[in-house]
Structure formats: structure tokens, C-alpha cells
């Protein structure tokens, strides 16, 4: 079968032929129809320090996808051949304390699809049936293919009550932009997002941001004054991993505010801890998606009118993957979709 693989320890990926995976007793085989390019895939493409330490070579990668079940193991229940599914990319052990307590997103033995094991940039993917998630017919393949990052945005944004609250989002990547739409959908008052990328800030405006602020030209304090925010933001969603963005967020938070951290800052990042302590801030780290509460919430929000269509900006056939990755690398895109139906 065709697959996009890391074949050598160097930048780039290669469209190549690999062996079709085998189905275990508790697995499903999915014929892939659409995939999306993630920021993780960009790290793998660039072959940066993280990728060099993490990604086995050779291996085909990718973890944002949708497809159709074409084969099932003999122990699988609850699915049928022909079911349209996406799937949870974190494969958990099922036996550690957190897994047994229903907190699988906190499994200490997590294995990542397309990171630690063969991924979804291929004609076929095999995963445990437990990880597969049926997609309702009214949700398009393109939207279903981005459930992984949509889930990151959902997990982060819904970590705290947003009804009537003022929300600051730092980082207008696709996940931050989707968090804008989620926050507005569930009843936030002001949703302000910051970045230095004008293209993506404009996407955030289309998704409902009250203000999309280029912090290289505009002061967040001035924006708060324009919005008559005398006390600061109630909730912060840090999506960038940029130390200066997190520092600015801490300064802009109201006393008693709550912050969810999805972005990964450098290991030695220093912050002003007096902002955290004297303001009584609550900070929560976010990893992946809650299994499977986040997935049910994603479907429910789409079915109740959440519109994510502006984030789907570019579509390519898989044979044009180099152009697709160049588009993503340019920074002037939302989500980039790869079509595998002609592979």
C-alpha cells in the first residue's frame, strides 16, 4: 500500500510502498479517505531535535484521519464493516491506575499513532477497536479528519466554565482558532486571541473572535480597555508555547483566574511566580483528549451549530503532499487536508 513515511534521518517524507498491516483479534482496519497535517507532522518533516529523539526510522507517520472499516478482528464488538470512523491517536495500556479509573488520557504508558507506531498517512490503518470512534453521517470527512486537533481545542477550552466569562487565547494556530469558536459557542463573553501571524488572526476573526490582536503592533492592555475590562481575563488558554505569550497572559489574568496550558514552552522557561501566587491562579496542563468525553462533546457541538468550516483552508491529493506540506510550513493556512481516495 502507499504511505507517507520517514525513510531516512533527514528532513522530508517520502511517498512509498509499505506492507499492509495485519489485524489482531481486537483491532479494526480502516481504509483511509482523508488525513490532515498536524504541527507534529511538521516537526517530523523538519526533523528537529524532538523528532530525532522520538520518531523511529523507517516508519509511516500521521495521526489525523477518517476512513471506513474494512476488516475487524474476531473479538471486536460494536462496529460493522463499512462504518465511517476516526479514532483516538493515543493508545493506552488499560492496566495502569489512571486507565483503570477511567482517566485514560493520563495513561503513563501511552503510545502515539504516527509517532511511536505506524500512522495514518497510508491507504490502511490498524488500531485497537477501543480507539475507533463512529462519525455521524451529517459530519463531513474533512471535519472528521481534524477531530484529533479539534479534540485538543475542546479539551483545553472546556476545562473550565466559560459561560459569561472573558477568555484570552494565546497562539492562533489551528487549535487556538478552533478554541475561539468553541468558547463563543458555549457562551463566553469576550474572546480575545493573540499572535503575530495576520493570516491566522483573520481566520480567528472569521471564527468569532471578539478581538484578534497582533501583539507586535497592538497592546493587549489597550484592547482590554477598549472592551471595558477593568479586572482582567477570567480564563486563559495558552496554545503557543511561547514564553512571552505566557508571561503576558499571567499579567492579564484577573485574580482567581484559571489557565489551561496546551502549548509546550522551553524546559527552562522562567515566569513571575508572584503573578500566580498573589492572584491565586489555577493552572492546568492539557494533554490529548479525554477518552471519550471530549469526542462526544465534539460531536454534540457540531450537531448544535458549531461551524469550523473556515479552518479547512486547503485540500490536496496525496500525490501532491510536498505542496501540501509547503503550504502548512508557510504559516498561511488553517488545516491542510490530504485526499487518499485516489491513492
From Swiss-Prot:
Record-given protein name: L-threonine 3-dehydrogenase
Membrane-spanning segments: none
PANTHER family: L-THREONINE 3-DEHYDROGENASE
Gene name of the record: tdh
Cofactor note: Binds 2 Zn(2+) ions per subunit.
UniProt binding sites for NAD(+): 175, 195, 200, 262-264, 286-287
Binding-site positions, Zn(2+) 2: 93, 96, 99, 107
CC terms in the record's Gene Ontology section: cytoplasm
Amino acid at each position: 500500500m502507499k504511505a507517507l513515511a520517514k525513510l531516512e534521518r533527514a528532513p522530508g517524507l517520502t511517498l512509498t510502498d509499505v506492507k499492509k498491516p495485519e489485524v489482531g483479534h481486537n483491532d479494526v482496519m480502516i481504509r483511509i479517505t482523508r488525513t490532515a497535517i498536524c504541527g507534529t507532522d511538521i516537526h517530523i518533516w523538519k526533523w528537529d531535535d524532538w523528532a530525532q529523539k522520538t520518531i523511529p526510522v523507517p516508519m509511516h507517520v500521521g495521526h489525523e484521519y477518517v476512513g471506513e472499516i474494512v476488516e475487524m478482528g474476531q473479538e471486536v464488538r460494536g462496529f460493522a464493516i463499512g462504518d465511517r470512523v476516526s479514532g483516538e491517536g493515543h493508545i493506552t495500556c488499560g492496566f495502569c491506575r489512571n486507565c483503570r479509573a477511567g482517566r485514560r488520557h493520563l495513561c503513563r504508558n501511552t503510545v502515539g499513532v504516527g509517532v511511536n507506531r505506524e500512522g495514518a498517512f497510508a491507504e490502511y490503518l490498524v488500531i485497537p477497536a477501543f480507539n475507533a470512534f463512529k462519525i455521524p453521517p451529517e459530519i463531513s470527512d474533512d471535519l472528521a479528519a481534524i477531530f484529533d486537533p479539534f479534540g485538543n481545542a475542546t479539551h483545553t477550552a472546556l476545562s473550565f466554565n466559560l459561560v459569561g466569562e472573558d477568555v484570552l487565547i494565546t497562539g492562533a494556530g489551528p487549535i487556538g482558532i478552533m478554541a475561539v469558536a468553541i468558547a463563543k459557542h458555549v457562551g463566553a463573553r469576550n474572546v480575545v486571541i493573540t499572535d503575530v501571524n495576520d493570516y491566522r488572526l483573520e481566520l480567528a476573526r472569521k471564527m468569532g473572535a471578539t478581538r484578534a490582536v497582533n501583539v507586535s503592533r497592538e497592546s493587549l492592555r489597550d484592547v482590554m480597555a477598549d472592551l471595558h475590562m477593568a479586572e482582567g481575563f477570567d480564563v486563559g488558554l495558552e496554545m503557543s508555547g511561547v514564553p512571552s505569550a505566557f508571561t503576558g497572559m499571567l499579567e492579564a489574568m484577573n485574580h482567581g483566574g484559571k489557565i489551561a496550558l496546551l502549548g509546550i514552552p522551553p524546559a527552562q522557561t522562567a515566569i513571575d511566580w508572584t503573578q500566580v501566587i498573589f492572584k491565586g491562579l489555577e493552572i492546568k496542563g492539557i494533554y490529548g483528549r479525554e477518552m471519550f468525553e471530549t469526542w462526544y462533546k465534539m460531536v454534540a457541538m457540531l450537531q448544535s451549530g458549531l461551524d469550523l468550516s473556515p479552518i479547512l483552508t486547503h485540500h490536496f491529493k496525496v500525490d501532491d503532499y510536498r505542496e501540501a506540506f509547503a503550504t502548512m510550513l508557510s504559516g498561511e493556512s488553517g488545516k491542510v487536508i490530504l485526499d487518499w481516495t485516489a491513492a
